[in-house]
């Protein structure tokens, strides 16, 4: 299973800029789709098997759809910070029936850290938003869940990835992704949930 997950992860973070167009202010528009298999970090007994099914919770699969925009590299301020992009995203996180499959809405920003060539670069991206639809702690129906205490949580994510420009319209990305879900102690219990994807 781990080997299969590793093989899948090589192509898991595929970003497909479906279109880009030039408008009067020289802005490039992009649409990206990602698939990120992830491991749940066992930071709580509930995740290690302390639940009704006596089941260790190991995996998460996240699917995202993102809209991004950026200045063309040859036009200022794009020339100052080449390759910087920002936008909005929508994600579905597939966990299990005890945690549910929440939907995240978030803002993101990213940029190259190092350009190895005109087509290959090392990049970062951060996401900040909200995740909706958790099966949170409930004294009657989900009493063992001390991880998520509410239906809505904050969603924070940081990615480090290699981008390979296949053409003007298509990129292939592969890297690592760390995510955190928490309601910021607005309700208890709230130990939070952490995942790591590749």
Positions of the model-derived regions?
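Transmembrane beta-strands of outer-membrane beta-barrel pores
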Residues: 35-41, 69, 90-94, 128-136, ...
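Residues on the lipid-exposed face of transmembrane beta-strands in outer-membrane beta-barrel proteins
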Residues: 33, 63-69, 107-113, 126-130, ...
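Transmembrane beta-strands of outer-membrane beta-barrel proteins
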Residues: 29-33, 84-86, 105, 120-128, ...
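Short glycine/proline- and aromatic-enriched beta-strand/turn motifs that initiate or cap beta-hairpins
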Residues: 21-58, 62-68
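Extracellular loop and loop/strand-boundary signature of outer-membrane beta-barrel proteins
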Residues: 49-53, 93-96, 142-148, 185-192
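Residues that define the transmembrane beta-barrel architecture of outer-membrane proteins
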Residues: 27-29, 57-63, 99-105, 150-156, ...
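Outer-membrane beta-barrel channels and translocator barrels
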Residues: 26, 70-72, 114-119, 165-169
């Amino acid at each position: 299973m781990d080997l299969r997950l590793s093989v899948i992860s090589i192509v898991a973070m595929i970003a497909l800029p479906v279109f880009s167009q030039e408008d009067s202010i020289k802005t490039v528009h992009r649409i990206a789709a990602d698939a990120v298999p992830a491991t749940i970090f066992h930071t709580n007994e509930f995740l290690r098997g302390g639940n009704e099914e006596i089941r260790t919770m190991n995996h998460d699969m996240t699917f995202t759809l993102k809209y991004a925009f950026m200045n063309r590299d040859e036009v200022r301020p794009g020339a100052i910070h080449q390759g910087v992009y920002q936008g909005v995203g929508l994600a579905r996180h597939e966990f299990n029936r005890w945690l549910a499959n929440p939907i995240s809405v978030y803002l993101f920003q990213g940029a190259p850290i190092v350009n190895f060539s005109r087509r290959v670069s090392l990049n970062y991206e951060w996401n900040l938003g909200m995740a909706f639809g958790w099966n949170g702690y409930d004294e009657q129906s989900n009493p063992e869940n001390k991880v998520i205490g509410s239906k809505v949580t904050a969603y924070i994510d940081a990615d480090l990835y290699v981008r390979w420009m296949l053409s003007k319209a298509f990129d292939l990305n592969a890297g690592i992704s760390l995510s955190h879900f928490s309601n910021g102690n607005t309700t208890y219990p709230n130990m939070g949930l952490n995942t790591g994807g590749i």
